């Protein structure tokens, strides 16, 4: 997720 500030929360 390049445009996501909290990328470590979008790891599924």
From Swiss-Prot:
**UniProt similarity note:** Belongs to the FARP (FMRFamide related peptide) family.
* Record GO cellular component, one term: extracellular region
What is the name listed in the Swiss-Prot or TrEMBL entry for this protein?
Answer: CalliMIRFamide-1
Recorded source organism is: Calliphora vomitoria (Blue bottle fly)
Q: Does the keyword Secreted apply?
A: yes
Positions of post-translational Phenylalanine amide modification: 12
Cell compartment(s), UniProt: Secreted
GO annotation (BP), single: neuropeptide signaling pathway
Keywords of the record: Amidation, Neuropeptide, Secreted
